[in-house]
Amino acid sequence: MRIYDPFRKKWIEEEIETPFPSKGLVATFPFVDLHVHVRLNGGEDYSSLEEASLVGGFFKVVVQPNTKPLIDSKEVLERHLDLSKNRAVEFLFAVSPFGSIEAEGERVVGFSTDGIEYDYPTLVETMKKKKKALWFDHSQMYEVDGIFYEGAPLPFQKRPRSNEAIAIARTVLTGLEYGFERFHIQHVTTKYSVEVISFLKNLAKVSCEVTPHHLFFCYEDIKNTNFKINPPLGSPEDRRALIEAVKKDVIDVLATDHAPHHEKPDDFLTAPYGSTSIEIAFPAYYTALGDLELVVKKLTKKPLEVLGVEARLTEDTLVFIDPEAEFIVDAKKFKSKGKNSMFDGVRLKGKVVALKLKGRWVMIDGEVIADQKEND
């Protein structure tokens, strides 16, 4: 079997025993997602998110803080740590910078502003006081806002496409002034943001990510409320700029922003933001970019670099992929409790077939193996 090592940028040929037909498959290091959401309280819990992650080929994910209640206190964080422990997927946490806790301790990787509305004075005061850590930034100027970007063919309040880029510059420059050194810009959406990030990389340690939906769709593709996401879909020109930025390494990481909702109303004004994507992230990225090595690098090596984690490829921990398989997405079959995917009904190329972690088969052909001890 052909194995791709993203850390050495090298293809290897090895014989690997599998409990499924392996002709035509390739294997590589399992995926890392820097951006997922959990709902609890009847929504996406850690069991369903774990299953969805494994089906997608992910073994390590970073949970964002905008749960109910926010992960902004020791008590709430400890609850999440307890609910997510002892699982096949390693759940890491980015906590709110606006609460009473610091970004330190067990499985905590940094601060995140994702899904938290704040103003500039609050940002300044927070950056002055908090211990310096990796800062995940949802870059948005809430003072001038709207459901979609200007140019979207829908009769709703719009936000300028420059909104995100201005917020990115504001966060990074303010953070530098108050001692922050590492910034990770979340879900980049416009050509303006790409240009600003490219410049800021000369001043600070800045990385960024893009979602599968922003690479695959633009605002001309909006059909229903599954396409209501924050930040919104950009223009066709923005989508092309994002693809080019991934190829040129201006965009470092591919991250899903997996935002599950069991049901979304048909009304754009009342429907929540978000799209479910972690189970079909690899094929969505592969279909959009068409470069297996590039996609694997930005789902493995690059997100681990953002986290400051060193890793190496071993034969007991692999994800198995069929790069030629094509299928039509059926969101009703997702393991996630969220069926709100804008990819529903879309034909994609590339399929995650199986996942092996520390010598144990944890997922085969879309089914999670419940009792992993049976693999011993």
From Swiss-Prot:
UniProt key word Zinc: yes
TM regions (residue ranges): none
A biological-process GO annotation: purine nucleobase catabolic process
GO cellular component term, pick one: cytoplasm
Active-site residue list: 257
One GO molecular-function entry: dihydroorotase activity
Binding site for Zn(2+) 1: 35, 37, 114, 257
Binding site for Zn(2+) 2: 114, 138, 187
Top EC class, one word: hydrolase
Residues bound to substrate: 37-39, 66, 230, 261, 273-274
PANTHER family: ALLANTOINASE
Role: Catalyzes the reversible cyclization of carbamoyl aspartate to dihydroorotate.
Protein name stated in the entry: Putative dihydroorotase
